């Protein structure tokens, strides 16, 4: 597996983190899991050799959008997919306006998620 196939998942719900991690492992990806934006930012190696981030918008503490804004200031930010149970259209459009690959509503359609990840990683994009 290429190192760019490591995916970071940031979600405050343990079941979501583990479910996504299991799904991605079964498709050949490695994962790093964080329960908050603060936890990710406090780990100096969190984004080392990462191909993609999946970030929940509604994190406790720092929101997913706040985390993305901080990460965007760093060089070499990998592609980001936002996820949320929020049904507001404005949330979707804000995620896209910030520069995310896309926004997926929970519960997440796993086929859509895997297709997006495969497409993005095959393009080797770094934002």
Located regions from the model:
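Short amphipathic alpha-helix used as the core "switch/output" element in two-component signaling
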Residues: 65-76
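Acidic, metal-coordinating helix/loop segments flanking the phosphotransfer/catalytic sites
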Residues: 33-52
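Alpha4 helix (beta4-alpha4-beta5 surface) of REC/receiver domains from two-component response regulators
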Residues: 66, 87-102
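Acidic catalytic/metal-coordinating carboxylates
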Residues: 35-36, 63-66
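C-terminal output helix
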Residues: 90, 108-118, 125
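The feature encodes the CheY-like receiver
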Residues: 57-60, 88
